[in-house]
A protein has these predicted regions:
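RNase H-like nuclease fold core
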Residues: 1-71, 75-83, 150-153
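Amphipathic alpha-helical transducer elements in NTP-driven molecular machines
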Residues: 16, 44-48, 67-74, 103-110, ...
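Structural beta-strand/beta-sheet cores of well-ordered domains, especially the beta-sheet scaffolds
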Residues: 18, 63, 87, 96, ...
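Short acidic (Asp/Glu) and glycine-rich catalytic loops that position anionic groups and cofactors
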Residues: 30, 90, 108, 152-160
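Hydrophobic alpha-helical scaffolding
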Residues: 37-40, 63, 99, 115-118, ...
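Conserved, well-folded catalytic cores of nucleic-acid-processing
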Residues: 53-57, 79-83, 97-100, 104, ...
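Conserved beta-strand -> loop -> alpha-helix junction used to position metal-binding or nucleic-acid-contacting
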Residues: 64-71, 76-114
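Acidic/histidine-rich catalytic cores and adjacent linkers
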Residues: 118-162
Length: 162
């Protein structure tokens, strides 16, 4: 579940619209676009309506959702599919957590952060996150805090084989 933002001409002026996309992958690995919705903003109510529409169209159960960091996703998913697991998109997490990292530190910080999200196991990832916090926590506390506070939805994929 994600959005693609684009400019459209409406009433002789350009405005930004979003196409909200839900891509599904079945147990055989086949990908299907389950729907595209045009809208103006994302909210829990919007995504809950989308998920309920998918249920109405025949989706009975969802094993795993991969989403960006919007809190509205989590709320809607937990309401519509309470047994589904959630994995936050690592790219979205990296972008949001490093947005205020100085250019002079970004390369070194990213090398250390990569050891967290590319670890082989959750235990290794947690150990690397502790090392990351020890090294960068005083300089970039919001970056470290973001990874710690979102760990439950950043580490979901460790439960599955690579």
């Amino acid at each position: 579940m994600d959005a693609i933002h684009y400019k459209v001409k409406e009433n002789h002026q350009y405005i930004t619209k979003a196409a909200y996309v839900v891509l599904g992958i079945n147990l055989d690995g086949q990908k299907d676009i389950l729907g595209i919705w045009i809208g103006e903003n994302e909210s829990s109510k919007f995504w809950l309506n989308v998920l309920n529409e998918l249920k109405t169209r025949g989706i009975k159960d969802v094993f795993l959702f991969c989403v960006d960091g919007l809190t509205c996703f989590r709320q809607a998913i937990e309401a519509a599919f309470p047994n589904a697991q959630i994995q936050r998109c690592i790219i979205h997490q990296i972008r949001s957590s490093t947005r205020f990292v100085s250019y002079k530190h970004i390369k070194e910080l990213m090398a250390d952060l990569k050891k967290v999200y590319q670890a082989i196991s959750e235990e290794e990832a947690m150990n690397n996150l502790i090392l990351f916090k020890d090294k960068w926590g005083k300089t970039y506390p919001s970056c470290v805090k973001s990874w710690e506070e979102n760990w439950d939805i950043l580490s979901t994929f460790f439960a599955y084989p690579p």
